[in-house]
Amino acid sequence: MATHYSIIGGMIIVVLLMIIGSEGGRLLEKKNRTSAEAEHYNVRRYLAENGLGQTPPMGWNSWNHFGCDINENVVRETADAMVSTGLAALGYQYINLDDCWAELNRDSEGNMVPNAAAFPSGIKALADYVHSKGLKLGVYSDAGNQTCSKRMPGSLGHEEQDAKTFASWGVDYLKYDNCENLGISVKERYPPMGKALLSSGRPIFFSMCEWGWEDPQIWAKSIGNSWRTTGDIEDNWNSMTSIADSNDKWASYAGPGGWNDPDMLEVGNGGMTTEEYRSHFSIWALAKAPLLVGCDIRAMDDTTHELISNAEVIAVNQDKLGVQGKKVKSTNDLEVWAGPLSDNKVAVILWNRSSSRATVTASWSDIGLQQGTTVDARDLWEHSTQSLVSGEISAEIDSHACKMYVLTPRS
């Protein structure tokens, strides 16, 4: 019998309890279910009908680095760089415009209009260019009467019209923000856009950005493909770790077709150390977060490229099982994060969030392995393998750094 993983069983039971309306219920312990059985266990999932997001989306978003200082040349050059740096071949496919791409006023027919100075060729021409590179284009709007910058109109009351416009341009992704919302509940403002996108005639990934205000992870699965669980990330250690913790508590609600979104990556923007960025990327990958690069990839340094192009870490994020890893142990800022992968493997992060070098240990009981299991431990950052590891895995780790492993049980 394949090795039993309590993590897989536990997370599946959480989903089942949610569906039958027993969110506060006691998790029933399931014995003797192999991980293969767990992977195929028939649990109903309420997912958006567009079939997108079977793994977390990967790509780039303009906001963290450029803010409103964005134009079509930057976007074209970013698409070029996505291909030339090898990121596209690793799965980074979305080139996403954030706020400020449109004129403040709609045209005489009520349609959104690209900013004439920044996007003189229009969004359709830009989408055509991005598509010619084998990539996909995303745009931004807001479930209010204006966007957060107040420089372009929101889509509240124009959902069907705007969705048809986006589809006619060849848009593949919509980030939908939450500003200028007139005090109307997100549960009233977001479903109309989800429905409009489904009726637009084009598959468009729907990224809901309501900042976790009304616990979208509970109700958004039938509406969108991802949902922000927190406010905006900032390019510093305290913001990144706080968001990681806030997002973690909703781990059981994520899965293929619908993902928790702790916001875009800050790797390469300069506000954290290399090891802090390594931790940032590792935790986002394990948490099955959308991997949307937020730096200027046209000018990124070698270290940034090395961090965001680690194929082994990306593979954890894109694993087909689609179970979000989570924090399973924390003692004095020494943490263990773990989650199950396909083929009975387990991903583990040993994270030192303390202010000094320390040893971090994950015992098999922490991460859901049976005590007698022997594994091969693949270090995803060192690209090395320890064979025949049993009982626990341990490492001495610098302050704010981490180690990330994939454990493969010996048969």
Swiss-Prot record:
Transmembrane segment boundaries: none
Disulfide bonds, paired cysteine numbers: C68-C100, C148-C179
GO molecular function: alpha-galactosidase activity
Sites where the protein binds substrate: E210, W211, G212, W213, E214
Nuclease among keywords: no
GO biological process: carbohydrate metabolic process
Signal peptide start-end: 1-24
Catalytic activity line of the entry: Hydrolysis of terminal, non-reducing alpha-D-galactose residues in alpha-D-galactosides, including galactose oligosaccharides, galactomannans and galactolipids
GO cellular component terms, A-Z: plant-type cell wall
Alphabetized Pfam families for the sequence: Melibiase_2, Melibiase_C
Domain of life: Eukaryota
Entry keywords, A to Z: Disulfide bond, Glycoprotein, Glycosidase, Hydrolase, Signal
PANTHER family assigned to the protein according to its UniProt record, in alphabetical order: ALPHA-GALACTOSIDASE, ALPHA-GALACTOSIDASE/ALPHA-N-ACETYLGALACTOSAMINIDASE
Record family assignment: Belongs to the glycosyl hydrolase 27 family.
Protein name: Alpha-galactosidase
